Structures are given as C-alpha cells and as structure tokens.
Amino acid sequence: METKMEIEFTKKPYIEDVGPLKIKSINFSVLSDLEVMKAAEVQVWNIGLYDHSFKPYENGLLDPRMGPPNKKSICTTCEGNFQNCPGHYGYLKLDLPVYNVGYFNFILDILKCICKRCSNMLLDEKLYEDHLRKMRNPRMEPLKKTELAKAVVKKCSTMASQRIITCKKCGYLNGMVKKIAAQFGIGISHDRSKIHGGEIDECKSAISHTKQSTAAINPLTYVLDPNLVLGLFKRMSDKDCELLYIAYRPENLIITCMLVPPLSIRPSVMIGGIQSNENDLTARLKQIILGNASLHKILSQPTSSPKNMQVWDTVQIEVARYINSEVRGCQNQPEEHPLSGILQRLKGKGGRFRANLSGKRVEFTGRTVISPDPNLKITEVGIPILMAQILTFPECVSRHNIEKLRQCVRNGPNKYPGARNVRYPDGSSRTLVGDYRKRIADELAIGCIVDRHLQEGDVVLFNRQPSLHRMSIMCHRARIMPWRTLRFNESVCNPYNADFDGDEMNMHVPQTEEARTEAITLMGVQNNLCTPKNGEILVASTQDFLTSSFLITRKDTFYDRAAFSLICSYMGDGMDSIDLPTPTILKPIELWTGKQIFSVLLRPNASIRVYVTLNVKEKNFKKGEHGFDETMCINDGWVYFRNSELISGQLGKATLGNGNKDGLYSILLRDYNSHAAAVCMNRLAKLSARWIGIHGFSIGIDDVQPGEELSKERKDSIQFGYDQCHRKIEEFNRGNLQLKAGLDGAKSLEAEITGILNTIREATGKACMSGLHWRNSPLIMSQCGSKGSPINISQMVACVGQQTVNGHRAPDGFIDRSLPHFPRMSKSPAAKGFVANSFYSGLTATEFFFHTMGGREGLVDTAVKTASTGYMSRRLMKALEDLLVHYDNTVRNASGCILQFTYGDDGMDPALMEGKDGAPLNFNRLFLKVQATCPPRSHHTYLSSEELSQKFEEELVRHDKSRVCTDAFVKSLREFVSLLGVKSASPPQVLYKASGVTDKQLEVFVKICVFRYREKKIEAGTAIGTIGAQSIGEPGTQMTLKTFHFAGVASMNITQGVPRINEIINASKNISTPVISAELENPLELTSARWVKGRIEKTTLGQVAESIEVLMTSTSASVRIILDNKIIEEACLSITPWSVKNSILKTPRIKLNDNDIRVLDTGLDITPVVDKSRAHFNLHNLKNVLPNIIVNGIKTVERVVVAEDMDKSKQIDGKTKWKLFVEGTNLLAVMGTPGINGRTTTSNNVVEVSKTLGIEAARTTIIDEIGTVMGNHGMSIDIRHMMLLADVMTYRGEVLGIQRTGIQKMDKSVLMQASFERTGDHLFSAAASGKVDNIEGVTECVIMGIPMKLGTGILKVLQRTDDLPKLKYGPDPIIS
C-alpha cells in the first residue's frame, strides 16, 4: 500500500499585514542634478507668489504642486489637505554654478590636492598608491579614513606652501589655494606668487589671456570661480575621489540645480485675507530667483561685462545665506530683519535636533506650586481636584468597571469624578457636553474607551527641574485632594532637591497600561530609595522628623499608658493592631520611655517579623574616659538597636537621615525590603508631625541671647586674639617674623593672623555651645542634624568671625587699605574683614560691608557654576549614554566596542553596595545581626581559630558552588573571619565564651554573605553610562569654583571643584596648577629631602649670585659674577662656578665661547669678544640677561615644597615621613632625579602621565584625581563610575577629552554628533563621505522613535511557545 505524503509549509503562502516598517539605517549622500530633478514635482522660476485673486502662481514658490500653501487649500499632486499632505519638492535651475557653502571646506581641500589645469592628483605616485591601499582596507574605520584623507590634504598644502608644485601630467605650475578675504565675498584664490625667474613673465602672459584676469587680485593670484572648479571636478577620476574619502562625484558639491523645499516646512500665513506673511526660507528663495533672473538676462546679452561677476557674487551670497545665514563673507550686506537659513533651523538649543527630536513638549501634564504633607505616604502625591478634572486617563470598558465608568460619563467633564470623552471601537468619539450624557452612559458597551478624570490610586510621574539624576523623576500614586497645590511627604524632598519656598513641580500621566506598569516597577519611589551614585539612602526623614525623634528618645522622656497609646495611634491609620511592650517602670505607676515608641514603630505587633540590629554613632557621641562601653555615652549618642528594640541612644540624622549606609532605613531596605523601609518612614512622618504639633517647638530671639558669662568670655577671647595679632604685625614691621615654609614675609603674616582669628571663632563657638541650655532650640536642631551647625549658632550668639574673599582676608580695594575708615597699610583684624560682633549684637557699618563682600562671592560663584556644571553634565551624558552591561558581563558601546570585560572589575551594582568605598557588604554589621538573630544554644558548638578557618572553607564551598563570588570578595571575607578567630582566642572571651563564634552562626553568616553578594550582581541591560554620567555631573552642582589648599601644604593652592573636574574630563594639556607628588628613597631624613629639592627646583643665577656687575677699565671690559655660597649651602644646592659656566654656555640666547668665561674661586669673569664701540651696550645687555639663566634644576619646575607625609599608615616606627610636592611639569625628569622613588611618584597632569608612563597610568590618574576632588568636597562617588569614565577617555589608546573634538573620535554616530554640537559640519561631512548611521545609539533611537537597545530593549531573542510544523515526507527509507 502506498503511503500518502503530507507536506506542511513552514511559511504561510501570504501575509496580510507585515506591521509598520522600521528604519534600519540612514545613508547620507549628496544629490546630483539629475537626482534633484527626479525628486522634484515642479520647476520653480516664477518670482510671483499670489495673483490678484490670491491664488498661488504656477511655477512659483507657492505652487500647489509642492503642497497646500494654507489650511484651506488642497495639494494638486496627491490631493491631500494641509494635515495629510507630506509636501513635495520643487527645483530651481541656476544659470551659473555656485559653491555649496556647507561643502566649502571640502571643495577647498580637493583643490589643494589637484592640478588646476588637468585635475590630476599632486601627490607622489608611491605615496598615492600607499594611501589608496590603506583607504581601500575594508577593516579601516570611517574615523581613520577621515584622518587619512586629512593627512593627504595636509601633505599637499604643506608642499604648496613651501614651493610651487609642478603637475607630473601636464606640467602646470600649482600654488597655494586658500579662501579669499571676507570682504571680497565667498570664493577661492589660487596664489602662484612663488614662481621664480623666467617663469613669471610666461605666467603673467598666460594669465592675461584668461577670462579670470578680470577678477585678479594681483597678477599671480586669481580667483577660481565655481564654473572653473566644476570643470576641474568633472575631470577628476573615481580613484582620486576614493583617496580623498569622497563617496560621490565631487561636482555634486557645487550647486547648479537647487531643491526647493515643500510648503509644509515653509507655510504661507494669510493676514486678514489681504496680505500674506511669508516664511524666512521663502523670502530667501525669492531673492535667489530674483538674482538668477538678473544673471540670465545678463548672460543672454552678446557681450559679458564686470556686472556679470557682481550679480553672480550676489547669487552666490544669497544661496549661501539660504543654507547658513551666519556664513562669512556677508558682513558687507547687513540686514534689518535677519532671516534664518536651513542650518539655523537645525542647530542650537532651539533647533530641530535638540528642541523637537531629542526631546519634545508633551500632553497630559500639569505644573503647580508644591507643599508638604506628612500625612501622605512617601509613594503618594496629592493632586488638586481642578487638575484631576483636566487630566484624563483612557480606561477600557469591561464588565468589571462598566458601572463605575457609566457614572463618570453621567457626571461629565465638570463634576468630579467624571469623564471628558468616549471613544468607540469603530474609531468615532463623542465629547461629553450637553444633555446627552445619560443616553451615552446607558449605551456604553464593553470595548469602548472612556477618557475619565484622574482618580485615587492612578499612576503619575512626578518631576522637578533641573533633573540632575535618575531620581529627579519618580512614579507616585495619585491622591485627589482639595486646594490648589501638589503635595507630597517631606521625606521625598532629597531626591528632587525640593524645598517649599515657592518651588514648582511637573506631573505626567502615563496613558497606557504598559506605561503604568513600567513606571511603577522601574520608577516607583519605593524602588528608588537609594542613589546609584554610591548606594546611600536618599529618601529619608528630614528636619522636623529628626527634631521630634531626637526629643522623643531623650533619656528623661516618660509616658503613661494613655499618652503612650495615643502616640502609638499617631503612627498609623487606625487600622493597624499594636502590641504594647512591657512598661519600663511598674511602680508607683506604669511608665513607658520614648525609646519604646521606636521599638513599636519598627515592630508594632508580633506578626511583623522585622528584626533590626544596628550600631550608629550620632553627632553628639562622646567617648567615655575609660572607653569600655559605648552605650554609656554621656550625651546618649550611641544608638543601639537589637532585634528591633532601641536599647540606647537619641535618634538623629545619622540614624534616620540620608547619606548613611548604616542608618535605620538603609538596614531595613537591605535586610528586608523597600516596603519595610517605606512603611517605617510613613509611620515616623505621621508620628513626628502630630507629636511636634502638640509638644511645640519654636525658635525666638531669646534663644540666641548670650548670658553675661558668655559675653565676658567672648570679649576676653577676642581681646586676647587681637593682642596676639598686633604682636605678629609688630614683628613683621621690625623684620623679626619667623617665615613659614615656602612663603615670604607678607604671606607668612597673613597665615599667622588667619590662624589666630580662626582660633578666636572656634574658642567663642565652644564657649557658646557649652553655655547654652540643653532645651535651646538652635542647639537641639544642631545636635540632631535637622538644621544648622555649631558654627551657625556661634555666629548668631557669639562672633561672626573672619570674612574671606577668594580664600584670603579682605583685599585693599581703597588706597592702601580696605576701606577709608582705616589707616593706610593697616593689617589689623578689624581692617581686613574680621567681624567681632554676633548677629544678635548687630554688625557695625564696616563689618556689614565686609560681610556683604563674602556673601557676594557666594552668589557670583553659584551663578557661574550653574552654567558650567550644566554644560559639563551634558557633555558627560553625550559621551557615556550608549554604554550598557551585556549578558556576557562586558560593558560595550552602541557599536559593540568593549570598554570593560567586567563592569567595575567585579560586576556589582553601585546602588546596592552596603560597605564603605564601594565594598559589597558590611561584614561587621552582618555578623552583629547574625549574633542577635542566632544566639548560642546548648546544642551549638564554639569554634577555635583553627576550626573557624576550616569550617569557613567548607561552608564557602557548600554555598558558592557556581563560583559567583570574586577572588577579591572571598579574600576580604576570609580576612574578616580570621579576625573573628583572633578575637575569640583572647583570654577573657575564652573564659566566658561571650564573644565566641558558634558553628551555626558561622554557617548562617557565610550563607547570608554569599546569597547577598549574588543578589548584588548588576543586571544585563543596565544603562551604566547614563547613571555614571549623572553620578559625576550631579555632585558638580554642589561644588564651589574656588581653589583649595593642597593636602597639608598651606602655601600651595591647587585648582579644585568644578574647574578641576573640567580640566580632567577635557584632557587639558596645560592645566592651571600641575603638581607632581614625589616620594623619596630616604623619606625619614629632612636633610636628604632638602638636598633632592635643590636638584629639582629651578634656580636662576640671580637667586644664587651675590653680585653681577660690569667692570670696565682702559684695557679690558668684563662682567663679574660673585656667587653667594651661604645661600647655596643653606638650600643644599650643588652649584659651583664650573656648573654655572656650563649653564651659561648652554643658554641659546647668549652666544659665548668657552674661552670667553674664566672661572674664579667664588665666581666667574665673562669677557666677550665685541667691537669696542658697542662694548658698553653689549655688556649691560649681558648683565640684564644673566640673572634669568637657569643654573640648576628642571626649567619647567616653578617651586618644590618639602612636606610631611600626612598618611599615618605609611609611617615607619612612628617617625615623620617626608615627601616633595613639585609645582610644575616634566614628570620624567623628576622621576629620574637621584633620591626620588620613581615607582611611587605621581602627577595630576593626565596628558603628561599618558606620554610618560602610558595609557593605563593615565586611566589610573583620571580615577584618582576625580576621586580626590570629590573627596575634598566631602562627596563620595562609587569608584565604578569613575573607572567607566576613565575607560571611555582612554579605550582608544589615547586620552580623549569629553568635549567636541574628543567625542568626535569616540566612534559615535552622525545623528548623535549632530545633536551635540556643530550640527551642520557633521551632517555635511557625513553626506560628502557617504557615511551610514545604523541607528544603534540612544540619541539616534530617540530621534527615530525606535526603542533603544538598553534596559528591556536589549532583548533580541524570544523563546518560541508554539511547536514548529513538522514536514512529513513519508516513512523512513529501509537501508539494506
């Protein structure tokens, strides 16, 4: 029996709907004349716009074939109306060619390389073939090809600048090609003035017979007009174009036929039906048609005239202005109302790229003033009813919500909760106005969409500008409330950097269920409690919440049952069950402490299994004299929670505030989840607001009123300080002042006086803090960290202190004094800006003036800084936006280049780091938790040191079978466990077994560590580039622009803050304060350090010479130099008369022979051979030059300072270590100086380090320098972000700055570069070179409206859920 074959097709015979097409890539090109004509629908030549009946002229600029000219018209090409017709092109034929100003530099570069008669390349044949072979290499990147083409142009232009180049094909003499001067318009000149001998006459004769002679500037320099250049370009071979990296024929770079853009991008606006207002582009095109018509008329005449050239130049300028209205060469024709060109529409902040494509205005948004509301949850935002009635959400009708939506429809748009519109499945819609609402509601069917008012629980996005980091826009749930402001919990102020002094915020309503889901998952407040900058918590309690917590948890706060129960009820919504803890005092009455309130807040009842264990040192922590037990702190500053019970401590900012990884909310988040932390924040906000409202807390003038004792103490301190200052001033005037290292007398005096005056303020501040009552409101706020510091209090109560301008005392702005109220040359504290009064006692007129000087500096600094940091952040974002982590753990950019094999060397997520300095876990705290939750039991075994190590290795193998943990993490964990072994082996613990480690504790500890480490791995698709850029850019706004004193060296000011960050990321070659930190081979001996300093520091002859004088007698004339041996010995300099002689002979400016200099015992005699008549002049000139000759050290080094090494970890047997700080450059020479340890010597100049030590050393320098700057400003940024930035700057083998030239070399796409800076240059360059943009990066995807390939967009492959159809070809063959 024959088996019937069954065939099932893998593909369907046809597909009805393929879905919308996506743009895969963009190919940039230059259109030829034929392509322009093919693309156009109509030829434009008519100068008129409308006829007398206001109908557009045919073949005019408003021809209806190019699209409807206004809203009432119809397109005659596609029959579309104003909304539907995309527009159609026209074309304008020019009678004479003109330069395309966008490609002007390309045209110039081509002309530099070709013969001006036969179009042959001027390059040597061997060089030509070599460069062409490189250019044809398929593996060569477009960036390298551009560089190669530039090298060819540079070679040809260099040859032309040195000599006349003779063409090897036709023998024509080619000179330099350059742009003509701006006053002559737009053109190119050919300069052949370097022709020599008999060639000149021949050349002049040849030029006199050419047409170009009329435009000649001089006989050997003539203008290459576009017609001539067009002919040259047409004769060029394709090989030559390939060598110059021009993808299309070069004649296309010259305009002979122009595209006229469609009317949709240059609409005509009718005003009152009697006149029209035309677009700038239409006005420009009208001028071009007018000029072309004049040119046509002139050319049609039998004889040519100079007028021909003038009209041609006019057309050239008009075409150039049409493309770019800011083009050079048009200054001689100023315009009353400047019209913008095509390029002006694209470039800048208001251009198409940045204003309409990269970002755009959106609907369904609201904006109003913000207010605080502690009764709202941190995940909620209070929205005014008025706003909720305007903003809508399209809800689809289903059987679950039909009745609710019917009621909304009945209510209509003006009654809340209502609806504004109903959309039906057939595409029609009805607006809910009038009396038809009831009928529409009754007819409402499943499948309809109702645009209903915003309701409680709807998902909204909340944003405050400036949006400096990811947490500046987060997702909240709507809570509809009366009044007119947006409200939210104050705990969420930090991420938005919001305050309530009139700030406004924006709100966006996502319009699809997918968008809502994505928003609540990725952008929800509870999922963004920590900042990815360094893993610190950002959403935390602030101000009043901290004050009330501090007061509630005082040792002397007690509550009876009624009061305690009432306070506990403040926390929740009255729905939570609360288990009252055992009272602290039972007799004579049951009393509970304030600390127990926080135990209830953390764990209201037994069903909530939250067990928090933590130790925190608060601001007012003071170590006891014996230092045995921290919990016995006299100020109750040691906060200790054990299993969610507060044992000791007054809670303040360190425990409840932001910026602490060991705070209460951080631990709730890490040990449990974000919900546990959010719930505790909500409870504390409600409790604090209600408690402080009833308890009362205010600040008044009597809080800053000093007592009699304090006033006397302050007066004595100030008088004592003034006396010290006057003594120092007298010492300075007598010349007896002891100088400080590296400083002269005046600077030493300033340093001394500043130190004394700072001591006055500190002394008065201490007296003030100790003299205030503990109930003093400013003191309470300072201690708990809610607002202010001891300095603020001491300025209000005791003494304002020294006012500084640019880090110095008040300068002498008047004649030899700061103000006319003081004597001349006065250095006294009062004359130089010291304010002895407090804000309470009031400032005198002069003190007030000095105080405003200091205040002005702060204001100016802030204003300048805002623009500087904003631009810095934008550059960082553009450079790093494409970087993401892939599934193979590598960090790559949009084009697939690997920047890091593992993100941050360990693949950890910075937002989840628990330890200091980016460590994944805090082992001490974790072990404390394990000890609390897993106490020793009778069946547990205590481990000795050896058993501990052995058990650890076993547990590690058991829990980390897949080897997820890195070697560095395992090493740090092993070190911690070994330290536990040392502790448990000490005698007291062995005796009592109180701090011993049991087997169960170790097992649980290792398990938790491995599990948590695994959880902290960064997810594939994370946009780490964007996060890194924001993490570096956002702290920049908090920095100052001032310079700081270098670490430990008062005399050495180095650039810090925003200017220093800019220097680093710009990869500046010449930084403002280059410093080399040089380690010594013998760091313990100061004499040795001074000797090495003498070898490095630049020393001039004038510094070590006792005298330099001219000796003239009747028989001889010479210059005698006497060296000062005392100075040479004190400075440990190795300078001798012989070494001075060699230095003089090596100086290029002084032309002396060996015989002219005679060495004496203590100096030299210089007798130059000169003409007697000029001897006097020459010797005095030599005398003036000699003091500046460098006789010792490195010439690029300005100064060397010997300083104490402040790093205590490097000290040997407690002895002081010395090092050198070298102010200047030439790292290589410093490293090679005898006595310097070159292996540990570093520089802060990134480019110099790169040249001296290589690219890896430069990468390390970038990381270290950014870390140092941030550290000096008290900011911590995860090192992984800095490593990523350093890798981006160095991954191509050279240090690339994060600015326009550096980003250009970073293999970025055309659209990205065009959206950054120099829009026109990048687009024209891409077109000339025929570049292809593959739409891979973030900017390109946003511009094209395509999902970007990061985050969820990284997924490319999906698992098939259906089985593939099987192909049945009958039974298997029987093989015999």
From Swiss-Prot:
GO biological process, any: DNA-templated transcription
Renumbered residue ranges of the record's region Bridging helix: 845-857
Keywords linked to the UniProt accession: DNA-directed RNA polymerase, Magnesium, Metal-binding, Nucleotidyltransferase, Nucleus, Transcription, Transferase, Zinc
Major localization listed first in the record, in broad terms: nucleus
Binding site for Zn(2+) 1: C75, C78, C85, H88
UniProt entry tagged with the keyword Transmembrane helix: no
Reactions catalysed: RNA(n) + a ribonucleoside 5'-triphosphate = RNA(n+1) + diphosphate
Protein localization: Nucleus
Short name of one Pfam family: RNA_pol_Rpb1_5
Residues reported to bind Zn(2+) 2: C115, C118, C170
SUPFAM superfamilies: beta and beta-prime subunits of DNA dependent RNA-polymerase
GO CC terms: DNA-directed RNA polymerase complex; mitochondrion; nucleus; plastid
GO MF: DNA binding; DNA-directed RNA polymerase activity; metal ion binding
Residues reported in the UniProt entry to bind Mg(2+): D499, D501, D503
Matches recorded under InterPro entries: RNA_pol_asu, RNA_pol_N, RNA_pol_Rpb1_1, RNA_pol_Rpb1_3, RNA_pol_Rpb1_3_sf, RNA_pol_Rpb1_4, RNA_pol_Rpb1_5, RNA_pol_Rpb1_clamp_domain
EC number assigned by the record: 2.7.7.6
PANTHER family hit by this protein: DNA-DIRECTED RNA POLYMERASE SUBUNIT BETA' N-TERMINAL SECTION (PTHR48446:SF1)
Annotated function: DNA-dependent RNA polymerase catalyzes the transcription of DNA into RNA using the four ribonucleoside triphosphates as substrates. Largest and catalytic core component of RNA polymerase III which synthesizes small RNAs, such as 5S rRNA and tRNAs. Forms the polymerase active center together with the second largest subunit. A single-stranded DNA template strand of the promoter is positioned within the central active site cleft of Pol III.
Subunit structure: Component of the RNA polymerase III (Pol III) complex consisting of 17 subunits.
UniProt similarity note: Belongs to the RNA polymerase beta' chain family.
Name recorded for this polypeptide: DNA-directed RNA polymerase III subunit 1
Species assigned in the record: Arabidopsis thaliana (Mouse-ear cress)
